[in-house]
Structures are given as C-alpha cells and as structure tokens.
C-alpha cells in the first residue's frame, strides 16, 4: 500500500532493530512509509492480514479489474476522512471510510464492487489502533460485499497530522436502464430519510467535546448498497438518491 514517502526517515533505533521486527514497539514510525522493508512489514502484518484478497495480494502498482458488460456504465467516487476522535460509539473512522464511499457509489444506482484505500499516518500512532481500524474496514467491506484491491500508505512527522487520515475511492457498475440524478426531481416529490437525523454528527461531537446526554447515542453508519438495490427493484419511481455528509442534511 504505497511505494514512496516524501519525508526523511529519522527513526531513533539501534542498528539491527529492524531485523527484530518493526512492529515490536507498537508505534507507527516514519520508516513505515519509506518504501523499504519496514513498509513491507506493515503491509504484510497489518493491511494484508486484515483484508488480503487475490487482487491486493498480487502487490502490483494497480489492480486490473474486469470491464463492465455492454450497456453497463461505471460509477466512480472518492472521499477523505479526518474524524476526531477516531473511535466513537457505533464505529470508528475505518467504518466511516468504507460506508461513505460505498454509499456514494450506490446512490448513483451502481452496484459497488471495488475500493482503494490510502492512509496518512502520524509518526507515533499506536499500531494496535491501526490494526483495529483495519479490522473494522475489512468487516465493513465484507458486509457491503466489496473488495479493497489497492492502496497506499504515507507517514508524516509527529505533530503534522491527527493520528490517521483515510482516503477511499470506489468503483461500481450501473446496470443498463438505471439513471438517477437531481435534474429528474419534480415539485411534489417525497423525500424519505433513513434513520434519525443527526445521530452520526452528534455522536462524534459528544465524544470530542465530552458532552453527555440522557439517551444513548450511537453512530448509525452502515453500507446502504443492499438497501438501495431493494429500493430500485421496486420500480422506476426513484429519481434521485443522496448520501449526505454528517451535519449537512439541510444543505443537501
């Protein structure tokens, strides 16, 4: 998941420590993004272990994927995630990274198939937290029925990041005959909404600011592609779908 790093490697370790296993101190180091043996180990022991598959394990610079059938179209979307805190009731930044892009692709009427994932890690980030995030991402990808097939990793100096940033991009196939878009909306159309408005945003904010509420708050982040497929199967009356960002329902 990545070949190069623009930052100099300045790990304060003794000669020979690398051969003993770079994950022994359970912290992300600059060398994990250098493109050398340290990067190979974090790829093997964290990323491949969490969501290795045939395409990813080939280790090529790009994943080569099947072309869509005649009449089908590709849907392509990308999103970046910079949530603080990274862990909150109902999920973590890894679940958001999978669900966000899967849902962005699905709302175009597409069947999401493949994802890429790019990590920007801060030096000193706990390896246990990174493994936990990757495990959640793998679990959520299985839930959505998609595969992580390519990725990249970079490490920035301590103090130049917020622990972990994640970018995911997704590709899906739009079946022949499916066409959704805001230009198709008409006056009088009904706008159904899934779930309780505001749950994801207020859950993260309450954790970040130390707020307490009488009700138990949980982020309801979930891959919606299977639900969307059922909605579209009901008939041609669905004109437009949107996956609003947290705290942005009004502007959507």
Report each predicted region and the residues it spans.
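Helix-biased detector of long, well-ordered alpha-helical tracts
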Residues: 2-252
